[in-house]
Amino acid sequence: MAEKRNIFLVGPMGAGKSTIGRQLAQQLNMEFYDSDHEIEKRTGADVGWVFDVEGEEGFRDREEKVINELTEKQGIVLATGGGSVKSRETRNRLSARGVVVYLETTIEKQLARTQRDKKRPLLQVETPPREVLEALAGERNPLYEEIADVTIRTDDQSAKVVANQIIHMLESN
C-alpha cells in the first residue's frame, strides 16, 4: 500500500475494534486512535462518567466532534465507538474520508467479551445485557452495513489474524 489511506473500524461493543485497531496500526506503521479514549483525554473523565453527567446525547455530540477532527488526519487507524454510526454526519464523514471496516461478531461473543467490563455505560442498566445487545444490534447493524467497504467476522480469531485479513482485503481492492 503506497499511499496510506485512513482505516476506520466500526462495529458493536466487544467486536475488538480497539484491540484489532492497535494491531493493524502497528503492522501498517500508522497512527492509532480510539474515539472513546480521545473523549476521555479531552474531558479528563471516563466514558461512563460523561454518559452519566451529559446523557447519551451529550456523549454522542462529543463523539461526533472528535471523529470529525480525527478523520481530517491522513494515514490513521481509528476505532470508533459502537454508537457513533447513529449520526448520519459521522457515517458520511467516515465513508468519505477513508476505508470503513465493519468488525462483525455474535451476541454470544459480545457477552463473553464485555461481561466483566464496567466501562460499558449502555450495559450498566437493569435490562439484561443480552436484551440490550440484541436491541443495539437491531438498530445499529444496518448502519454498519450501510457504510462498510469491508466486513470481517471477528468471533474466534486473534487480533493479528483479523489485522492480516484486513490488510489482505485492502491490498486486493
Swiss-Prot record:
Membrane keyword on record: no
Entry GO terms, CC: cytosol
CDD domains the record matches: SK
GO annotation terms (biological process): amino acid biosynthetic process; aromatic amino acid family biosynthetic process; chorismate biosynthetic process
UniProt: Mg(2+) binding residues: S18
Gene3D superfamilies assigned: P-loop containing nucleotide triphosphate hydrolases (3.40.50.300)
KW ATP-binding (keyword) present: yes
Coarse class of the protein's main subcellular location: cytoplasm
Entry keywords, A to Z: Amino-acid biosynthesis, Aromatic amino acid biosynthesis, ATP-binding, Cytoplasm, Kinase, Magnesium, Metal-binding, Nucleotide-binding, Transferase
Compartmental location: Cytoplasm
Annotated catalysed reactions: shikimate + ATP = 3-phosphoshikimate + ADP + H(+)
Cofactor note: Binds 1 Mg(2+) ion per subunit.
Annotated residues for binding of ATP: G14, A15, G16, K17, S18, T19, R120, Q157
Gene Ontology molecular function, alphabetical: ATP binding; magnesium ion binding; shikimate kinase activity
Binding annotation for substrate: D36, R60, G82, R140
Enzyme kind, highest EC tier: transferase
E.C. designation(s): 2.7.1.71
Pathway where it operates: Metabolic intermediate biosynthesis; chorismate biosynthesis; chorismate from D-erythrose 4-phosphate and phosphoenolpyruvate: step 5/7
Domain of life, per lineage: Bacteria
Quaternary structure annotation from Swiss-Prot or TrEMBL: Monomer.
Function statement: Catalyzes the specific phosphorylation of the 3-hydroxyl group of shikimic acid using ATP as a cosubstrate.
Family: Belongs to the shikimate kinase family.
Name this polypeptide is given: Shikimate kinase 1
Source organism of this protein record: Enterobacter sp. (strain 638)
Gene: aroK
